A protein has these predicted regions:
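Divalent-metal-activated hydrolytic enzyme cores
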Residues: 77, 81-99, 103, 135-210
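Short, hydrophobic/glycine-enriched beta-strand segments
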Residues: 17-24
């Protein structure tokens, strides 16, 4: 373990532990007995992280294969319903999600990748069906909603969004930053260490959200006026929120033609305006 300006940092980090929808690793747990293996997650990122696979529908005992399920009703509080049998699974999934989220909270996760469009795991824009009219893409999977409510600081993304280079880079950056924050807190946070952590991440914060960087700096400066626990909790929430803001690359103007060199002037020459005007010849009387 090393110390930089009071900031505790490990020499070699253990593999980062992330939760993931099990089907994305190739596990045949989908309703049709298939999977949605994602090569980047399973092969590329998988070499550097420890995955914790979860399939809430299988853990609920729905079996493989199983009857399709979907969200219905109010997007803010949808019901989870089996399509053919019309079995209402809302309460059962809510109980499972709460229990599973508590288990995951004890596993020291630093990120989570969810399956897009899933009625249980979708992070956003999940179809919510209604009695009349087309389905609306305004829902969140029941398990995903509970997970994000229980672990609000946890970096969470969907595999579909991770195909975008900028979103992928942002997620990985947030995962590593959150891991550093959790490590700093676990090592024992003090006011000097909080100040050192902020100093080490100030440039990163400023690139994402200059306003948040200033607010966090003020929070650190005034940390002695309040309880350390409250200061650490508020800083952690602000730190994670600031990194969710996308960095907008600065557009550089194309270089124009070089300016012409300034005319060299003799050191003895005087400005034309300072030269005396020539005398006019006097006329004869």
């Amino acid at each position: 373990m090393t110390r930089r300006r009071g900031y505790v940092q490990t020499e070699a980090m253990a593999p980062l532990r992330l939760g993931i929808s099990a089907c994305l690793l190739g596990q045949a747990v989908r309703y049709d007995g298939g999977h949605k293996r994602d090569p980047f997650l399973a092969e590329t990122l998988g070499r550097f992280v420890e995955w914790v696979p979860v399939c809430p529908e299988v853990e609920l005992g729905l079996g493989i294969p199983r009857e399709p399920i979907r969200l219905e009703g109010d997007p803010a509080a949808p019901r989870l319903v089996a399509v053919k049998s019309r079995r209402d699974l809302t309460r059962a999934m809510a109980r499972l999600a709460r229990a599973r989220a508590e288990q995951l909270a004890r596993l020291d996760l630093v990120g989570y990748v969810l399956k897009a469009d899933s009625p249980s795991c979708g992070m956003e824009r999940v179809r919510v069906h209604r009695d009349r009219g087309p389905a609306r893409r305004r829902g969140t999977g029941l398990f995903a909603r509970t997970l994000m409510e229980r672990l609000p600081l946890l970096p969470v993304e969907e595999e579909g969004r991770l195909r975008d280079d900028a979103l992928r880079a942002s997620f990985i950056e947030r995962v590593f930053a959150y891991a550093r924050w959790k490590g700093a807190v676990a090592a024992g946070m003090t006011r000097p260490r909080l100040a050192a952590f902020h100093a080490a991440h100030e440039a990163l914060l400023r690139a994402h959200d200059p306003g948040a960087c200033r607010r966090l700096g003020a929070l650190v400066a005034n940390a002695g006026k309040r309880s350390l626990r409250a200061a650490v909790a508020d800083y952690g929430a602000g730190f994670v929120a600031a990194l969710r803001t996308q960095v907008v690359p600065t557009r550089r103007r194309a270089p124009g033609p070089p300016a012409p060199p300034a005319a060299r002037r003799s050191p003895t020459a005087r400005p034309a305006a300072s030269r005396p005007a020539p005398r006019r010849p006097r006329s004869s009387p």
